[in-house]
């Protein structure tokens, strides 16, 4: 998903940034996936797997978004045990913990034209449905759609955080690449879930 979206993410990032967001996302997701495969092969539990994947993402992608995504995976992993398979409620709680770590570390708020503009509606949707009788796939898919809608709406916002803030209104009419990549990855997870 990140690899397929890399050119478009780079293009929209170049409008009011350095144009490397797509590359960073590809490097981060590739490193995290490799680490996760290695952890699975070593029979690591969910906590260890996500902690290692987070460290790999952070190191592989570098930059601010690498640190944010890496921290989010580590925070999500902290919800799990290495001894038992995660429950649906634990998976949702872990995703919310990951989202909270991004807002805590990055300091961005909704309306700043960042990943947070997609992340908060995603997490809010998960919170609303955590006790639902719906399947994890249904709950996650609804949250991913909320993230996508919010990510697209960032085209109407002037950036107040990150590198894009120094470019004034240059990014108006273009969505935030971090919000778009967040929504893409959450939809990829929804598509993967059973």
Tell me what each language-model feature is.
Residues 1-194:
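N-terminal loops that bind phosphate or other acidic moieties
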């Amino acid at each position: 998903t990140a690899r397929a979206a890399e050119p478009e993410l780079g293009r929209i990032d170049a409008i009011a940034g350095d144009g490397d967001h797509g590359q960073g996302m590809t490097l981060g997701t590739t490193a995290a996936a490799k680490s996760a495969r290695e952890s699975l092969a070593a029979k690591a539990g969910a906590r260890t797997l996500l902690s290692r994947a987070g460290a790999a993402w952070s190191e592989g992608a570098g930059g601010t978004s690498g640190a944010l995504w890496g921290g989010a995976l580590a925070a999500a992993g902290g919800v799990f045990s290495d001894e038992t398979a995660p429950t649906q409620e634990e998976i949702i709680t872990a995703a919310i913990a990951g989202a909270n770590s991004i807002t805590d570390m990055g300091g961005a708020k909704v309306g700043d034209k960042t990943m947070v503009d997609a992340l908060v509606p995603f997490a809010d949707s998960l919170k609303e449905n955590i006790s639902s009788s719906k399947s994890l796939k249904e709950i996650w898919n609804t949250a991913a759609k909320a993230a996508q809608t919010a990510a697209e709406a960032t085209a109407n916002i002037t950036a107040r955080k990150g590198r894009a803030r120094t470019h004034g209104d240059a990014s108006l009419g273009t969505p935030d690449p971090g919000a778009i990549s967040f929504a893409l990855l959450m939809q990829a997870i929804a598509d993967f879930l059973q």
